[in-house]
């Protein structure tokens, strides 16, 4: 992944993108959905991250700087979207549902999250494929 750049520059780009991604995730989740277990916030953030990732995937063929070893890819796709999307929060909420034996919510949330992720990455790729 880091073949085109020095390792330190690659790490810096990922970190530089990760900080605003994490802040955006926190602001969206906290401001829109204030309860402790915010399944809707996680769905919103992850779906929008998948939509943006679909956009970048669609543009990879046309914009050299979005290829896997390029600065823009590391900054936006790995850094920003990697910290903006909330896989660990997703798993934590699934765990809470499991521990609380809320089986219907667990399966609904899990499959909705995965399904929306696939739909939104496909939608982003389709909408922005030029």
Curated annotation (Swiss-Prot):
One of its GO terms (molecular function) is fluoride channel activity. GO terms for biological process: cellular detoxification of fluoride. It comes from the Bacteria. The lineage of its organism: Bacteria, Bacillati, Cyanobacteriota, Cyanophyceae, Synechococcales. Keywords: Cell inner membrane, Cell membrane, Ion channel, Ion transport, Membrane, Metal-binding, Sodium, Transmembrane, Transmembrane helix, Transport. This is Fluoride-specific ion channel FluC 2. Fluoride-specific ion channel. Important for reducing fluoride concentration in the cell, thus reducing its toxicity. Belongs to the fluoride channel Fluc/FEX (TC 1.A.43) family. Na(+) is not transported, but it plays an essential structural role and its presence is essential for fluoride channel function. Pfam families: CRCB. It catalyses: fluoride(in) = fluoride(out).
């Amino acid at each position: 992944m880091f073949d085109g750049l020095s390792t330190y520059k690659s790490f810096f780009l990922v970190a530089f993108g990760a900080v605003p991604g994490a802040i955006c995730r926190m602001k969206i989740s906290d401001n829109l959905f204030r309860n402790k277990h915010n399944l809707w916030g996680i769905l919103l953030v992850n779906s929008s991250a998948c939509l943006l990732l679909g956009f970048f995937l669609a543009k990879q063929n046309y914009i050299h700087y979005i290829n896997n070893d390029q600065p823009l890819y590391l900054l936006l796709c790995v850094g920003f979207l990697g910290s903006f999307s909330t896989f660990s929060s997703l798993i934590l909420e699934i765990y809470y549902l499991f521990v609380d034996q809320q089986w219907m919510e667990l399966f609904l949330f899990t499959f909705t999250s995965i399904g929306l992720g696939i739909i939104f990455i496909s939608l982003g790729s389709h909408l922005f494929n030029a």
